[in-house]
C-alpha cells in the first residue's frame, strides 16, 4: 500500500525536475507536488520550490541529506522567497482539529545555514485560556510577525505587545529560574525547544476569524497559518538545575525577578500529595521541572525516554529519574490577587526504578505542542541519563513505538512485550452520545504505595471542577477520611498485594455522565477487547449501586446506575471496605499566594455555614450563609496549632478537615 501511495505522489507532481546541484527535488513555477494523507515521500538530498511552485503536504515528507544540501523557496528569478505559500503542512480536517491528521516534515543532515525555505504550518487547536501554551518551530522568526489583522495570513490575527499582564505579551519559560520571562516582540525566536506562552486576549486558537485567509483550497476562516524557516536537527537539552538553589520561601511567598510570588504561578502536581497541608515544605516541590516546546514539524514520542530499550537502535534517551510528564496544559486561568495557574492539565507519571508510564500512556506530542518533564532528583549526569535528545523522538505515527523495535521515524507501533508489572484501569465518563467528558486512572503494581505517603508516587490530583475521580484510599479499603477533604485524584496508585480485593471508591459529579467505559492496560499495552484477566490471572472488578460485583473487561461500556462505584483489583472473600455515599468536592486547602487556608467549594454548593474549632473544642470562627462563588479565607493567626474546620452546605452536606496553622 505504501508503494502505491508513493507512486501516486510522484504522478501528481507537475513540472518536477531532478538533478540540480545539492537539490534532489525541484518544483517549478505553476507546479504542485501533492503528498496525500498517509503517504510517505523520501527525498535523499535537497529540496526547493521556485516561484509559485507548491509542495502540498497532507502526509509525511522526509528530507535526508548532508551539510551541503539545501532546503529553499526561491523567487522566479532565483532569489530567496520569504513570504511562504510553497511548503504547506496541512491540517486535514480543521473542523475536527483534535482528531485530525496533518502533514509532517522531517529534516535531517542539513545545516541550519542551508535551510532558508519557508514552511507554512496550518494551525488550529483548543484554546488554553488566558495564555496559549505553544511551540514555535521556526528558526530566527521575528516575534512581531505573529501580529496582524484578522485578515492577514501568517499571523494570529491580533497585536502582541511588551506589556506584562496585558494578555497581549509573549512569555517564555526559563527552567533555571522557574520564571516566565517577557520576550520583546522585536526579538527573534531564541531557541528551538523554547516553551512560549502567548497572551490570548482577542485570540481563540480553536476558532480562527472568518476573514482569516488560508492557502487554497482551504477555505478562509478554517485555520491559522504560521510561517517560517524550520530548525535543523540536533536539538538536545540537559535536564539539570531547574530552580536549583532558589529559595521559594515559606509557602512559596518569596518573589522572583518580576516581584511575583512563586506561589502565584508555580505548580507541582507531582509532589503536592507528599504533604498536602504544606506542599512547599517538600524539598523537591517546584524543582526539577523542565518545560519545552516541540522543536520539529513531526510528532515526538516520549513513551520510552525513561527506559533502556531492548532495540539496537534506540531513541537515545534513558532518563531513569523521570517522575512524570504533563502533556496537556489544560486551561490557563489568570485571577486577580491570586495569580496564573493551570486547571485540568493531563499527566503521565512513571514508577520509580525501571520507569513504567501510568495514566494517558500515548505520550505523542504533536508539532507546535508543549510538554513538561518532572525529575525525581537533581543528581549529576551519568552516561547521558540527564540529557534529552530530541532527534530520535521524532515519529510520524500517532502511536508509541515498541521498545524492542529499532528506532526510525516510520517505525512500527507499540506492541505487547509482556514484561511489565503495572496494571492500569482507565475509567472514561461518556455522555449520551458516547462522547468523552472525563477520565481517571487506577494503577496497581508490586512496589506501589497504598494510601497517603510523603514519598513521590505516580499520583496526580484533581480540582473542584472535575467531575470524575477517586480519593486517597485507606489501607483497609475505602476513602481515608484524613484526606477526603484535602485532595482527590486523577491518577491513583495502590499496592497490588496489600490492596488486593479492597475497595477504591469512584465518584461521579455530573448527571451528564451516562456511561462508563473501561480501558485495561498492562505495562502501557492495551489488553485485547473483552479480556478480563491480566498476566497474573487477576483482573479488575466494579461494584455498582445495586451491590452486584462484576468483572471489568477491556473496552467494556456500562450504563451509569448511580454516582458512586467501587473498584477492585482482584476478588477476595471480603471485598474491602465499601463507601455508601460519595464525598463532597469541597476541600480545605492551603493557598500559598495569600498564606492562608481556604475552603474551596464544590460547584454544586450554593451557600455554606463554616465553623473552626481548636482541639479543645472551643469555637474560634463561625460564619453563616457564605457565598460559594469564591474561596472562603480562614483568618487565623499563626500559632503552630491544630484546628478542625467544618463546612455545611445549604442541603446539609458536611465536610470536616484538620489543619495546622
Residue ranges and their predicted role:
Residues 92-140, 245-279:
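Extracellular, surface-exposed repeat architectures
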Residues 28-31, 36-38, 44-46, 52, ...:
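Tight coil/turn sites that cap or link beta-strands
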Residues 185-201:
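Extended, domain-scale alpha-helical bundle/helix-rich regions
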Residues 1-23, 653-655, 660-661:
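Sec-dependent, cleavable N-terminal signal peptides
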Residues 202-631, 637-639, 649-661:
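Compositionally biased Ser/Thr/Gly- and acidic/asparagine-rich
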Residues 10, 14-109, 376-377:
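Extracellular beta-sheet-rich ligand-binding/adhesion modules
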Residues 644-648:
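Extracellular recognition modules
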Residues 127, 133-170:
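Conserved "landmark" site that anchors the functional core of diverse proteins
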Amino acid at each position: 500500500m505504501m508503494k502505491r501511495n508513493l507512486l501516486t505522489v510522484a504522478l501528481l507532481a507537475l513540472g518536477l525536475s531532478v538533478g540540480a546541484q545539492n537539490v534532489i527535488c525541484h518544483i517549478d513555477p505553476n507546479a504542485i507536488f501533492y503528498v496525500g494523507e498517509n503517504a510517505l515521500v523520501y527525498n535523499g538530498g535537497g529540496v526547493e520550490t521556485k516561484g509559485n511552485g507548491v509542495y502540498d503536504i497532507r502526509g509525511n515528507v522526509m528530507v535526508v541529506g548532508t551539510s551541503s544540501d539545501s532546503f529553499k523557496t526561491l523567487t522566479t528569478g532565483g532569489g530567496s522567497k520569504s513570504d511562504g505559500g510553497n511548503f504547506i503542512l496541512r491540517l486535514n480536517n480543521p473542523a475536527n482539529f483534535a482528531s485530525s491528521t496533518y502533514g509532517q516534515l522531517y529534516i535531517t543532515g542539513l545545516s541550519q545555514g542551508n535551510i532558508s525555505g519557508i514552511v507554512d504550518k496550518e494551525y488550529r487547536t483548543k484554546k488554553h485560556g488566558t495564555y496559549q501554551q505553544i511551540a514555535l518551530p521556526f528558526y530566527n522568526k521575528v516575534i512581531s510577525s505573529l501580529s496582524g489583522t484578522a485578515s492577514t495570513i501568517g499571523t494570529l490575527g491580533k497585536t502582541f505587545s511588551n506589556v506584562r499582564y496585558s494578555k497581549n505579551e509573549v512569555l517564555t519559560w526559563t527552567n533555571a529560574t522557574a520564571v516566565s520571562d517577557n520576550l520583546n516582540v522585536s526579538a527573534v525566536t531564541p531557541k528551538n525547544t523554547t516553551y512560549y506562552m502567548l497572551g490570548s486576549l482577542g485570540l481563540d486558537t480553536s476558532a480562527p476569524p472568518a476573514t482569516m485567509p488560508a492557502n487554497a483550497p482551504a477555505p478562509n476562516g478554517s485555520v491559522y497559518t504560521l510561517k517560517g524557516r524550520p530548525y535543523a536537527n540536533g536539538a538536545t537539552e540537559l535536564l539539570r538545575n531547574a530552580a536549583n538553589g532558589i529559595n521559594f520561601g515559606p509557602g512559596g511567598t518569596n518573589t522572583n525577578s518580576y516581584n511575583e510570588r512563586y506561589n502565584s504561578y508555580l505548580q507541582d502536581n507531582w509532589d503536592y500529595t507528599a504533604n498536602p497541608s504544606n506542599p512547599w515544605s517538600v524539598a523537591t516541590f517546584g524543582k526539577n521541572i523542565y518545560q519545552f516546546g516541540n522543536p520539529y514539524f513531526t510528532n515526538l514520542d516520549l513513551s520510552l525516554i525513561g527506559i533502556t530499550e531492548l532495540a539496537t537502535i534506540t531513541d537515545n534517551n534513558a532518563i531513569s529519574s523521570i517522575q512524570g510528564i504533563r502533556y496537556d496544559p489544560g486551561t490557563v486561568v489568570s485571577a486577580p490577587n491570586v495569580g496564573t495557574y493551570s486547571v485540568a492539565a493531563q499527566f503521565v507519571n512513571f514508577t520509580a526504578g525501571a520507569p513504567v508510564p501510568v495514566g494517558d500512556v500515548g505520550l505523542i506530542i504533536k508539532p507546535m505542542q508543549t510538554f513538561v518533564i518532572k525529575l525525581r532528583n537533581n543528581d549529576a549526569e551519568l552516561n547521558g541519563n540527564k540529557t534529552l535528545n530530541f532527534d530520535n523522538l521524532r515519529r510520524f505515527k500517532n502511536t508509541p513505538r515498541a521498545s524492542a523495535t529499532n528506532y526510525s521515524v516510520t517505525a512500527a507501533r507499540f506492541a505487547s512485550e509482556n514484561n511489565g508489572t503495572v496494571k492500569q484501569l482507565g475509567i472514561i465518563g461518556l455522555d449520551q452520545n458516547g462522547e468523552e467528558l472525563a477520565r481517571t486512572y487506577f494503577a496497581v503494581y508490586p512496589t506501589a504505595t497504598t494510601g497517603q505517603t510523603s514519598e513521590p508516587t505516580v499520583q496526580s490530583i484533581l480540582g473542584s471542577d472535575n467531575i470524575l475521580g477517586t480519593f486517597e484510599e485507606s489501607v483497609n479499603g475505602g476513602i481515608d477520611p484524613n484526606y477526603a477533604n484535602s485532595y482527590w485524584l486523577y491518577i491513583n496508585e495502590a499496592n497490588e498485594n496489600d490492596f488486593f480485593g479492597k475497595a477504591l471508591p469512584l465518584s461521579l459529579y455530573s448527571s451528564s455522565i451516562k456511561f462508563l467505559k473501561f480501558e485495561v492496560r498492562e505495562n502501557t499495552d492495551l489488553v485485547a477487547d473483552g479480556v478480563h484477566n491480566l498476566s497474573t490471572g487477576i483482573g479488575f472488578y466494579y461494584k455498582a449501586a445495586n451491590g452486584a460485583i462484576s468483572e471489568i473487561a477491556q473496552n467494556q461500556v456500562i450504563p451509569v446506575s448511580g454516582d458512586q462505584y467501587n473498584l477492585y483489583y482482584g476478588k477476595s472473600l471480603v471485598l474491602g471496605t465499601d463507601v455508601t455515599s460519595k464525598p463532597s468536592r469541597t476541600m480545605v486547602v492551603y493557598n500559598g499566594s495569600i498564606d492562608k487556608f481556604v475552603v474551596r467549594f464544590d460547584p454544586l454548593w450554593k451557600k455554606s455555614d463554616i465553623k473552626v474549632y481548636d482541639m479543645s473544642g472551643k469555637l474560634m470562627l463561625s460564619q453563616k450563609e457564605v457565598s460559594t462563588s469564591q474561596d472562603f479565607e480562614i483568618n487565623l493567626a499563626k500559632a503552630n496549632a491544630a484546628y478542625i474546620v467544618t463546612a455545611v452546605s445549604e442541603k446539609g452536606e458536611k465536610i470536616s478537615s484538620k489543619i495546622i496553622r
